[in-house]
Amino acid sequence: MSTCKICKTELTWENKTLCIRCGVEICEDCSTRNKFKCDKCADKLKIKIPDVIRRSSIEDYKSCPYYFKLHVIDGNEPRQNVLARLGSDLHDLYEHIQRGDVEIKDIDTQTDWILSHIEEDYPEEDMNRVEQRARISNQSFIKLLPTLTNKAIAFEERINFSIGEGIPQVTIAYDRLEEDENGDLHIVDWKTGKVMSGKKLTTDLQPALYLQAVKEKYGKMPKSFKLVYVSDIDKQGNYKERTFHSIDGNKFVCKVGNKEYIQDISEQIKVVQKLFAQIKQGKFSIPAKPDYFKCKMCDFKEKGLCSGNDTQNWININEERQKYGW
């Protein structure tokens, strides 16, 4: 007499089947529950979810769950595009200037050093385009500094915080946290990309997660969150910005012209909780309507890890069928 390796139920010709990976005998009920595998083999295939997930990776999951899987779950590192690399290096430079480690008069010399190293790492890129963005960003940062009159209490601080039990923590890192004369907090974060506009001002997760992170760390919700786009300038050469002001401590409004865009912190947290639940369930399909430009430029496609939206979905489905004997 044989018994199921999982539940110890007596096996008969009516209920006996085999684990599709190792071949041990299990009952049909356990087989169905474990996707045709014994407990030992099922554990080996369980998705290892990180304890902490970056805010930017959450946005990646919203955009393309399969990209998130390849990067965060499988551990494949995408190559930074040249402008993202520039943005990262300039952020480091601006932090050192704020801290007093680098004098503002040396910003061009430091930028020349940054550009020389980028050119070494990206010999195929048009460095005139990269240098132009760097110089515009520096000019904007020089204009920005005198306007930052509140007391700075933290630079480039990373905060991990929980949004619920049984799901990963979120981690964020802002550029500058200020305190005004009334003791109220204000977040300032600069960007080297294009200014945020339209519906994205309501749906983007960065404002809500940054505000909630500071509340968790400092015990009170900031009064504002400002995004400064140092490389995106208007016809007068002034940098563009978007500022979210507190309405009631949980909702923030960003006014652009005659339009108002609301960020509801509680609702945005619920969005992230739902996304984390989907991640735990192993939902990593490519979206039906992906960002085709992002898909075309994806480094994972260049590395042969993804065949693009139309082809990769079929590959993934067929791999699942082979795994589970569908």
Language-model features and meaning:
Residues 3, 9, 192:
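Ser/Thr-centric signal marking residues that sit
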Residues 4-7, 19-22, 38-41, 295:
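Short cysteine-rich clusters marking metal-coordination/redox-active sites
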Residues 11-22, 30:
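Canonical RING-type zinc finger of E3 ubiquitin-protein ligases
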Residues 12, 27, 35, 46, ...:
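Short functional micro-motifs and their immediate structural scaffolds
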Residues 24-42:
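Cys/His-coordinated zinc-finger cores
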Residues 43-326:
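RecB-family 4Fe-4S metal-dependent nuclease core
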